[in-house]
Swiss-Prot record:
It comes from Thermoplasma volcanium (strain ATCC 51530 / DSM 4299 / JCM 9571 / NBRC 15438 / GSS1). This is MEMO1 family protein TV1383. Signal peptide: none annotated. NCBIfam families: AmmeMemoSam_B, PRK00782.1. Belongs to the MEMO1 family. Pfam families: Memo (PF01875).
Length: 269
């Protein structure tokens, strides 16, 4: 099955050349990552707003030899409490078709109590779709991916999926798709996001969930972030913030913004 793009022309240009031009404009200066990336956190807003921040994470993956990606994001319209996997086929974007790794998808599905095969839930969800053009820009056709979107994002689900991922037979890089605090003043977004990011960097999983609830941090893909944190903690990886921004940096309206973060988890080689 080929999944057709749901948000081309809305979250990113539907024209191939315009899309390539926009992504290539997100030139960022950053140091080489001197360790082996196991995963990243990336935003999933319209890429004119969050693409520059997202590029920090994708640049961190540039020199990795691993070309199989598990992309986990939120289901913004959850019809089920379960996590939905798109098990086979490909996803179409203006840059071509990206191939699903059916072997890894099948393993992940079998390893988890909470993952169900559910292509329909992916049909209009954007949190994974907006990542595909970045991977195509970076790696052409030389990658595969597995898409999973979360309904319930609580710790029990995150722990189950993290455990399922750690039992996969092939190496992969985890892409956790999440925006951070939504639609508050930029100073409030900065405070809430940095409070949450400090928990992420410290691999404080309980503190992370406590902060989400106590501070009402509206990070829509928090379950995906938690999965990355759990895996990083279990294997002794470290997490670092690469970049943080908000939509006001593009619109110049700082009264009601959305926060974006680029974060990498890696272990020493």
């Amino acid at each position: 099955m080929i999944r057709k793009p749901a948000v081309a022309g809305y979250f990113y240009p539907s024209n191939r050349n315009e899309l390539l031009s926009l992504i290539s404009s997100f030139h960022v200066q950053q140091s080489e990552v001197s360790c082996q990336p196991i995963g990243v956190v990336v935003p999933h807003a319209g890429i004119v707003y969050s693409g520059r921040t997202a590029m920090y994470s994708y640049n961190a993956l540039r020199n990795s030899s691993i070309r199989d990606f598990i992309i986990i994001g939120p289901n913004h319209r959850p019809m089920t409490p379960y996590a939905s996997i798109f098990p086979s086929g490909s996803w179409e974007t203006p840059l071509g078709n990206a191939i699903i790794n059916e072997e890894l998808a099948s393993e992940l599905y079998k390893n988890s109590q909470y993952i169900v095969k559910d292509e329909e839930s992916h049909s209009v969800e954007h949190s994974i779709e907006v990542q595909i053009p970045f991977l195509q820009y970076m790696f052409g056709n030389s990658f595969t991916f597995v898409p999973v979107i979360l309904g319930d994002q609580e710790k029990v689900v995150a722990n189950d999926i993290a455990s399922a991922l750690m039992r996969l037979s092939k190496p992969y890089i985890l892409i956790a798709s999440s925006d951070f605090t939504h639609y508050e003043r930029s100073d409030i977004v900065e405070r809430k996001d940095m409070d949450l990011i400090s928990r992420i960097v410290d691999l404080d999983i309980d503190g992370f969930y406590d902060t989400i609830e106590r501070e009402n941090v509206t990070a829509c893909g928090y379950g995906a972030i938690a999965i990355l944190m759990i895996i990083a903690k279990k294997i002794g990886a470290k997490i670092s913030l690469l970049n943080h921004s908000n939509s006001g940096d593009v619109t110049n309206d700082y009264d009601e913004v959305v926060g974006y973060s680029s974060i990498v988890a890696c272990r020493q080689i």
